Amino acid sequence: MTSIRALVLVIVALSVQLVYSQVETILDSSEYDDLGLPTATELKPQIAGFLANDGTDLFPAVSMSNDGPSMAYQQRASVSNYANNPFIARAEQYRKAHSSSTRPQSISSQQQQQQQQQGYDPRDGTPYTRDIAVKQGILRGFVRVMHPQSGLKNVDQFLGIPYAEAPVGSRRFMPPSAPIPWNGLKMATKLSPVCPQNLPSLNNANNNYSKGRYDQIKRLLPYLKVESEDCLYLNLYVPSYDGIGPQTKYPVIVYIHGESYEWNSGNPYDGSILASYGQVIVVTLNFRLGILGFMKPGISDHTTSNFGLLDQIAALQWIKENIGAFGGDAKLVTVMGQGTGAACVNFLMVSPVAKGLFHRAILMSGSALSDWALTQHPLQSTMQVLQGLNCPLNGENDEVTACLRRKRYSEILGVKTASPQFSTRFGPIVDGLVIPNMPHKVMGQYSDIFSGYDLLYGMTELESYHILNAVALTYGLLENERDNLLRFYMQNRFEIRPDLALAATLREYTDIYMDPNKALADEHRDNLLEILSDARVAAPMVQTGLYLSKVNPKCYMYVFGHNSEAGEYGRLSQSVVGEDLAYVFGAPLGQVGPFQHHYNARERLFSEAVMKYFTNFAKTG
């Protein structure tokens, strides 16, 4: 396990970098006000749909209690008056000014009363759910019948529910709009297409992946084959109501998928076992990825971006308005993410646009403070794409966007752009609205923005395991190979004296970790993995927890320390990134999602414990 002394060193190094960061944020522009929001009036209608809300509780006053459990390093602190926060005040002004923005249409009272007796699919006998009335129309899903010996209750699945209008044609590179109502009954029994994406190659001729990583990706890819720009759908996994006694209001867990900002989907992650065991509603969703989801589609400071995050906000808005029809509690919504999904959740925690849409957060192996969480040079990425598509580099925003909309999405995905190691090509950016400022500034200076969220966060022990290829993981590294890779990382991470950061880090880690009984090549490899795991994931997550624990005592940290014994990493002494997901979704209790299917009795009990911890947090914080 990573030593505290080494972890503190990385935290200090990261803090120094934050102090001396030379990144010029959007807030320094005269075209944005002192709160980081655009002054241009033409942008206001575009964001109105996200700042408008049917009720007054989108930006509620925060009442915090200092009572409750806390970690050893947590401190009590008074919370600033929520109404005095400038970010929230400006967002509230927009919300009130545009309260007449289009909202999802309500269905008639006659439709709301239409409830059909449970039927069966005539093709295979699969039982249907009861009909559910949401604002857009009537939905019918199917029941997943659990094996009687499992001890699990049945789960109603509603798959492929549109939470926003399809972002095609003139809607491409635009914020999501409300979903279009439908007439009659909509069968919610099939997963939707995934959003357009460039999938990782399984060509392992150069041993790009370890055997374990290769097998993981191979299991995941079949879920991602059918894609379309019409992809803004979510899936609900709801404990079946047996009709006996009053129906319970279930807490809600919304899962934001990880792996990458450029590929993957919520579809592979079947929430049935987690929903049944924990008696919660589990929601998975798709959001726009890569260029279509995160590229800034223009060179003007006023260009709207972060469409992937706006999609997530739109999904949370749909959940808030409709989850009650499924027996869910709109006041008990937890958003959970892993990897890049965890960074997205953290961004939503500091976004005034997402206020009031969820109440608790679970961060797994990621943070908004991680060096990979933001695209640091979005304009460079945009210029490369425009050049590759022969779109005007110096045109007005409308001209550039029109050119991008004329292209087939396959052309857009096919553009070749530079992808240096340790950098993010197309991910969230500081836009002054969804992400109002650099996350460390928002969490440090405007902590009341995210103080209302309870937080559970944690990591595995080898978060950077997949950085190395199979050869390096098997045979280790030479000292100069380790140092060259670390030197390149430090140069990308620190603008001031990266050589000093490298020297101090190596001195600290080699002093702690040098093992005379281990081969030098293995030692150098393990040094590298420990340093990068701490610097890129562990230290940023601990810092996020420190920020929040100062204003909210319900802040809990865990370390996941188990690899499946029959899985890809069973021989390793430390847990590998992503190994926790199978236990959170209950894979040892039954076949769900893209996980291996060989678990022993002890691991089934362990999965039950993990699900209990996570769902208890969703229920009570």
Question: What are the functions of these language-model segments?
Answer:
Residues 211-213, 296, 359-364, 521-523, ...:
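Surface-exposed beta-strand-to-loop junctions
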Residues 406, 410-601, 613:
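Substrate-gating cap/lid region and adjacent catalytic-acid/histidine neighborhood
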Residues 2-3, 14-110, 117-309, 330, ...:
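Non-catalytic accessory segments of hydrolases
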Residues 156, 229-232, 310-313, 317, ...:
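A structural signal for well-ordered alpha-helical segments within the folded catalytic domains
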Residues 351-355, 550, 587-590, 620:
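Short, well-ordered loop/turn and helix-capping segments at boundaries between secondary-structure elements
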Residues 323, 548, 618:
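Hydrophobic pocket-lining residues that define ligand/cofactor binding sites across diverse proteins
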Residues 301-304, 308, 371-374, 378, ...:
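Residue-level preference for long, well-ordered alpha-helices that form the structural scaffold
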Residues 7-22, 221-397, 401, 406, ...:
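Serine-hydrolase-like catalytic core of hydrolytic proteins
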